[in-house]
From Swiss-Prot:
This is Cytochrome b6. Component of the cytochrome b6-f complex, which mediates electron transfer between photosystem II (PSII) and photosystem I (PSI), cyclic electron flow around PSI, and state transitions. The gene is petB. One of its GO terms (biological process) is photosynthesis. PROSITE patterns: CYTB_NTER. Binds 2 heme b groups non-covalently with two histidine residues as axial ligands. Binds one heme group covalently by a single cysteine link with no axial amino acid ligand. This heme was named heme ci. The chain crosses the membrane at residues 35-55, 93-113, 119-139, 189-209. Belongs to the cytochrome b family. PetB subfamily. It comes from Synechococcus sp. (strain WH7803). One of its GO terms (molecular function) is metal ion binding.
Length: 218
């Protein structure tokens, strides 16, 4: 590269970053690709917004049944731009689910799930399940009346499963009833377990797309 900087030359010598950039920028894009093929990328952007705003809220949120609601109120009323951070988090969550649904429909209607892209489809469906689980766990964190009863209903659903139903309910709730252990588990799932799971499946998903390319037209 002409007129390159010393910093660029230092990285180029060690990592060959120009070859990486050329490989990314020269990937063939089929002529049938249109704006609807951007829905997956928009979903990723929504996830990144979720991650950033969620991380910011962890500085103020207190995952206890006694202080969860008041900490959310403090974030909304006393923290500078706290209302904006939480509002962006909520709206981007809704947008992420909407974009995900549209993306799934686009892939299905254009046959993007067919051989040899079955595993790409499986990882995508897995991410869809994780995304919905994000909504269920996040809904409970303010620990208001809506959140409490939502957790009570959702965590009680597995009771209908034969043999292991009661065990699954107790596992979700952290005991026989909804309480502090339930909130702690949902907070852990929402802020640590699920983000890592989603990141891993996203990486697998993108690597498969990178390897196999975009599916052709119907």
């Amino acid at each position: 590269m002409a007129n390159s900087s010393p910093v660029y030359d230092w990285f180029q010598e060690r990592l060959e970053i120009q070859d990486i950039a050329d490989d990314i920028s020269s990937k063939y894009v089929p002529p049938h690709v249109n704006i609807f093929y951007c829905l997956g990328g928009i979903t990723l952007v929504c996830f990144l917004i979720q991650f950033a705003t969620g991380f910011a809220m962890t500085f103020y949120y207190k995952p206890t049944v006694a202080e969860a609601y008041s900490s959310v109120q403090y974030l909304m009323t006393d923290v500078s731009f706290g209302w904006l951070i939480r509002s962006v988090h909520r709206w981007s969550a809704s947008m992420m689910v909407l974009m995900l649904i549209l993306h799934v429909f686009r892939v299905y209607l254009t046959g993007g799930f067919k051989r040899p892209r079955e595993l790409t489809w499986v990882t995508g469906v897995t991410m869809a399940v994780i995304t919905v689980s994000f909504g269920v766990t996040g809904y409970s964190l303010p620990w208001d009346q809506v959140g409490y009863w939502a957790v009570k209903i959702v965590s009680g659903v597995p009771a209908a499963i034969p043999v292991v139903g009661d065990f699954m309910v107790e596992l979700l709730r952290g005991g026989e009833s909804v309480g502090q252990s339930t909130l702690t588990r949902f907070y852990s799932l929402h802020t640590f377990v699920m983000p890592w799971l989603l990141a891993v499946f996203m990486l697998m998903h993108f690597l498969m797309i990178r390897k196999q390319g975009i599916s052709g037209p119907l």
